[in-house]
UniProtKB/Swiss-Prot annotation:
GO terms for biological process: cobalamin biosynthetic process. GO terms for cellular component: plasma membrane. GO terms for molecular function: cobalt ion transmembrane transporter activity. This is Cobalt transport protein CbiN. InterPro entries: CbiN (IPR003705). It is a multi-pass membrane protein. The gene is cbiN.
């Protein structure tokens, strides 16, 4: 194996191991994985905000909500992929 490949494998191993070492067992209780959505929600609730309107339809469960989100992401990815492929093919035909 060439030296270049060994260096690349070492870098990949470091990239994989480093987050596991830094994590050090801190969990959600300590707020390690708290996101900006959670922090924003807490601030809004502290202010006593009342929503102006309610959603027309709410998914019956979190799984269905996740399914709808995944479908939306998949449809968007298909549309973006189609246009990228279309313009690449158009450019190749023109060349």
């Amino acid at each position: 194996m060439e030296t270049k490949h060994i260096i690349l494998l070492a870098i990949v191993a470091i990239i994989i191991a480093l987050p596991l070492i830094i994590y050090a067992g801190k969990g959600e209780e300590e707020g390690y994985f708290g996101g900006s959505d959670d922090q924003g929600c807490e601030v809004v609730e502290e202010l006593g905000y009342k929503p102006w309107f309610h959603p027309i339809w709410e998914p019956p469960s979190g799984e269905i909500e996740s399914l709808l989100f995944a479908l939306q992401a998949a449809i968007g990815a298909i549309i973006i992929g189609y246009y990228i492929g279309y313009y690449n093919a158009k450019r190749q035909v023109a060349a």
